């Protein structure tokens, strides 16, 4: 079975502009494989092809790509989900971030927005526990669906609001994490966290397009978390 690819290529050291390059690969009839497996095989043929990868298990978030127009992880996306009769599999870097080379993007702006929400527990220490900050099961359960984010950036780079305001809008990944700490019973800085997001851009640039929900490889729902943050901000200002 012949597999045909059209892959984004750009090496700033030698290229004046990006280009799409065609590749072919012979797939084993009756057997599927992940896109990352195909990319590794293509790199064996063309060592100049650049992309990120690490765990190959959908855990590290390194290999986020745009595949046939939709963001996802190459390591858990089967080729069978991308093949269409008479069409090439089109692979591009995650949109909205500067391209370093080929499919490798500069994640600096994504991480900068994530750091703004202070993604760690803040506790004033006024009531220090004897051993640790305990949580009831129902308190811990509230964090499910919030802490599992692997920072692959698939959500933020599929969001038009992040494309338009990458230095002002925190983005789906950052806001999902922000809500996780806002409702954590061990965190005492809810008010200061909300104050840091009370401007017109940080949260309210989300227009509930829900691209982030559509592409999240972990099945998380940043839009819902952002909606809760909006409600908290509105209640705070009332």
From Swiss-Prot:
Q: What is its EC number?
A: 1.3.5.1
Q: Which residues form the 2Fe-2S ferredoxin-type domain?
A: 1-97
Q: How is the cofactor bound?
A: Binds 1 [2Fe-2S] cluster.
Q: Which residues bind [4Fe-4S] cluster?
A: 149, 152, 155, 216
Q: According to its UniProt record, in which pathway does this protein act?
A: Carbohydrate metabolism; tricarboxylic acid cycle; fumarate from succinate (bacterial route): step 1/1
PROSITE patterns recorded for this chain? Answer: 2FE2S_FER_2 (PS51085), 4FE4S_FER_1 (PS00198), 4FE4S_FER_2 (PS51379)
Spell out the SUPFAM superfamilies in the cross-references.
2Fe-2S ferredoxin-like (SSF54292), alpha-helical ferredoxin (SSF46548)
- Residues binding a ubiquinone, per UniProt: 164
Quote the subunit structure annotation: Part of an enzyme complex containing four subunits: a flavoprotein, an iron-sulfur, cytochrome b-556, and a hydrophobic anchor protein.
* Family the UniProt entry places it in: Belongs to the succinate dehydrogenase/fumarate reductase iron-sulfur protein family.
State the name under which the record lists this protein: Succinate dehydrogenase iron-sulfur subunit
Organism of origin: Salmonella typhimurium (strain LT2 / SGSC1412 / ATCC 700720)
| Gene for this chain | sdhB
